[in-house]
């Protein structure tokens, strides 16, 4: 009888332990993920009226949508999401006219969250603040205007500038036509004059690349041959040549917001018309955005001494065992140490705006860039929070690695895209 009683008690205790264990595991799985410190990178898009900035914006958001096989996507607030969707609908519908350009009153800032997809829940890796300026504002340069003062301030505080060149006008310039010369030497020069006031990376994008042909290139010329000819022609313009020589990072990127089989140019009227049976297939539109963070961090890294980099790398594993909140709070004391002071000096030399500890933490993680042997790393963590935190860091590293690969592919396929580095 006593044996049966003891057995019954042990059975009950075992059931209790099992139930409690399940509840603990359930609570752990339901525990919210730690949040990544998310810095914001500031981008200003410039271009004359009719250059294609508005269509580029719609195509850009489309290209960074969530899609199978890619571990990240761009998101924004619901109102902007609906507006960009409507804008894209007007672009792709052959029965609809092209969207009108951004008016001076329509200049606005778009906030795009780069969301990484991990098993537990999506999390924001970083944010892009994208300012789309109206092309007509360049007509006011030299005048006294509050909007211009704001534009100058934003340009000087930007992490990257995207200068949109109208591919149709560039083609006219390559053909030696008067309208093309006036566009490149006068209108583009005004935009370049503004860009010269900034010290950040510059991305000159040749929009409407599907229309850039028939300017004397061989019949079988590929994108590299055409881009090389475009680059050499643009470098004959003094303002552009001076801009490139004075910058450490200037890229020339051919893009088509709609693709090569979507629209045609009516040579008699100069109008770009949609094909009734056109295929919407954007080309390279995501590359100017993908290059921003790798280029920025590479510039900071190149200005640092190797001893500082080794110190940061040596401290990497210890930092990975801290939560995101702990990392951000400890950055202040790190920046007072020799390695931290050197890093801060390098960042200050590249960024010309205030920045928070979130950016420093992301920069530290990028410099260390572990081999990411996930199983070994995850097994070394003693707590669930440490493992989940590592997964967040790793998810963001995957995004930056993908961006870097896109930049490498661009440089390999189109060496002429690198004007200055």
Residue ranges with predicted function:
Residues 157-319:
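Conserved GTP-binding G-domain of TRAFAC-class P-loop NTPases and closely related GTPase folds
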Residues 132-134, 166:
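MIDAS-like acidic motif and immediate structural context at the N-terminus
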């Amino acid at each position: 009888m006593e044996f049966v009683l003891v057995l019954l008690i042990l059975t009950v205790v075992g059931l209790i332990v099992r139930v409690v264990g399940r509840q603990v595991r359930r609570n752990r799985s339901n525990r919210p993920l730690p949040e990544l410190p998310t810095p914001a990178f500031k981008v200003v898009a410039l271009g004359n009226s009719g250059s294609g900035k508005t269509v580029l914006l719609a195509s850009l958001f489309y290209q960074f949508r969530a899609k199978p096989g890619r571990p990240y996507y761009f998101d924004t607030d619901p109102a902007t999401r609906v507006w960009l969707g409507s804008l894209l609908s007007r672009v792709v519908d052959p029965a609809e006219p092209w969207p009108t350009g951004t008016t001076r009153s329509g200049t606005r800032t778009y906030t795009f969250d780069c969301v990484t997809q991990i098993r537990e829940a999506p999390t924001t890796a970083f944010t892009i603040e994208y300012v789309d300026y109206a092309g007509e504002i360049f007509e006011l340069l030299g005048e006294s205007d509050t909007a211009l003062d704001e534009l100058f301030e934003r340009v000087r505080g930007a992490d990257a500038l995207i200068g949109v060149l109208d591919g149709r006008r560039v083609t006219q310039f390559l053909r030696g036509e008067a309208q093309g010369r006036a566009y490149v030497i006068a209108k583009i020069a005004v935009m370049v004059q503004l860009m010269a006031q900034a010290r950040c990376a510059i991305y000159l994008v040749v929009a409407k690349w599907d229309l850039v042909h028939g300017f004397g290139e061989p019949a079988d010329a590929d994108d590299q041959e055409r881009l090389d000819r475009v680059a050499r022609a643009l470098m004959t313009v003094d303002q552009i040549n001076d801009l490139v020589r004075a910058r450490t990072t200037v890229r020339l990127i051919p893009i088509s917001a709609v693709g090569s089989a979507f629209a045609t140019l009516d040579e008699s009227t100069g109008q770009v018309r949609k094909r009734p049976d056109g295929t919407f297939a954007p080309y390279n539109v995501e590359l100017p955005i993908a290059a921003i963070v790798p280029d920025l961090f590479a510039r900071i890294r190149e200005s640092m001494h190797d001893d500082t980099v080794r110190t940061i790398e040596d401290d990497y594993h210890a930092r990975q065992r801290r939560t995101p909140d702990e990392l951000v709070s400890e950055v202040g004391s790190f920046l007072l140490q020799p390695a931290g002071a050197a890093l801060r000096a390098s960042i200050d030399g590249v960024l010309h705006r205030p920045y928070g500890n979130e950016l420093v933490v992301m920069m530290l993680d990028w410099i260390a860039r572990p081999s990411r042997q996930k199983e070994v790393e995850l097994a070394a963590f003693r707590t669930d929070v440490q493992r989940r935190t590592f997964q967040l860091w790793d998810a963001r590293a995957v995004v930056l690695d993908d961006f870097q690969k896109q930049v490498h592919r661009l440089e390999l396929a189109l060496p002429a895209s690198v004007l200055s580095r």
